[in-house]
Every structure is written in C-alpha cells, then in structure tokens.
Amino acid sequence: MADPARARRLAKRITTIVASAIEYEIKDPGLVGVTITDAKVTADLHDATVYYTVMGPTLDDEPDYAAAAAALERAKGVLRTKVGAGTGVRFTPTLTFTRDVTSDTVHRMDELLARARAADADLARVRVGAKPAGEADPYRDRGSADEPSDAGGLVIRTSDGLEAENTGDDYQAED
C-alpha cells in the first residue's frame, strides 16, 4: 500500500498528463470540448479513475456525452502509455473515465436556490399587505387601561376582578 499523499500526487500528475495529451497531442474530434477535472488513484496505485466534463459547441447546445465517452475509450491506450512515460512509476495504472457530475449538481442547486428566492419574494409581497388576525396586542385588556396610581405604581386588575397596585418590587429579600 502506498502513502495517501503519494496517491494524491500521482492522481494530480495523471490529471495534468491526460489533460495535456487531450488538448495538444490526440487529434480526435470526439475529444473537442472534453475537460479533465480530477483523478483518483487507488491505494495500491494500480487503478486510476479520471473524471471529465464535456462542453457543447455553444453555451445553449447540449454536449454529446456518448461521443466523448467513446473517444476517451478509443484513446485510453495512448493515454495510459503517456501516463506511464510521464509518471515514472513501476506499474502504470489502468485508466477508467467517468463523467464528472459536479457541474450538473451545482446547476441543480442553483435552480433550487433560485426557486427558493422566488418563493421568498412572493411571501414578502404577501406579507406587505397582511394585517394581524385580531388585535395588535391581544394581551392588553381594553376595558381597564393600566393607569398610574397615586403612589406611582400601576394598577393591575387580577383575574378575580380586584385591583392591585404594582410597586415594582418583584424581589423582596427575606429577613
């Protein structure tokens, strides 16, 4: 088993080699618009999974994922040879190409966030014209407004209908 740091370094080197080979050396029309995003290498350094994305001819066109996958399968042997020559490891890892769905997930999350923002905006528009259902202060007794007494406290009506004076002394020390 190799050191995890060594596996990460090898994966980064494989990403660079494969991306450079696709961009400058392999002339396959199916690889136009293919971008290598990441690579993962197993702990024994024998297998590498290379992640890729595909861009369409224009921003509005859907990319041809099947053609890109077929082109990568055709170029797999050449790419593995270039990885073996460029890495200098004893055993050249086998390459497996997997479409990177991170950008699709990001796009989906952006759509969900936009939908949530629109729902929040609708709720804010409804909230502007809304009135409370009932009194603004439902706990205030309208019949007996709290008035100051002669002693400076507030007169409070209890549940029995009796009046009591609130002197503000909620805490009284015991002797």
Curated annotation (Swiss-Prot):
It comes from the Bacteria. The keyword Cytoplasm applies. GO terms for biological process: maturation of SSU-rRNA. Residues 129-175 are annotated as: Disordered. Signal peptide: none annotated. InterPro entries: KH_dom-like_a/b (IPR015946), RbfA (IPR000238), RbfA_dom_sf (IPR023799), Ribosome-bd_factorA_CS (IPR020053). Residues 162-175 have a biased composition (Acidic residues). GO terms for cellular component: cytosol. The keyword Cytoplasm applies. Keywords: Cytoplasm, Ribosome biogenesis. GO terms for molecular function: ribosomal small subunit binding. Belongs to the RbfA family. One of several proteins that assist in the late maturation steps of the functional core of the 30S ribosomal subunit. Associates with free 30S ribosomal subunits (but not with 30S subunits that are part of 70S ribosomes or polysomes). Required for efficient processing of 16S rRNA. May interact with the 5'-terminal helix region of 16S rRNA. PANTHER family: RIBOSOME-BINDING FACTOR A, CHLOROPLASTIC-RELATED. Monomer. Binds 30S ribosomal subunits, but not 50S ribosomal subunits or 70S ribosomes. This is Ribosome-binding factor A. It comes from Mycobacterium marinum (strain ATCC BAA-535 / M). The lineage of its organism: Bacteria, Bacillati, Actinomycetota, Actinomycetes, Mycobacteriales.
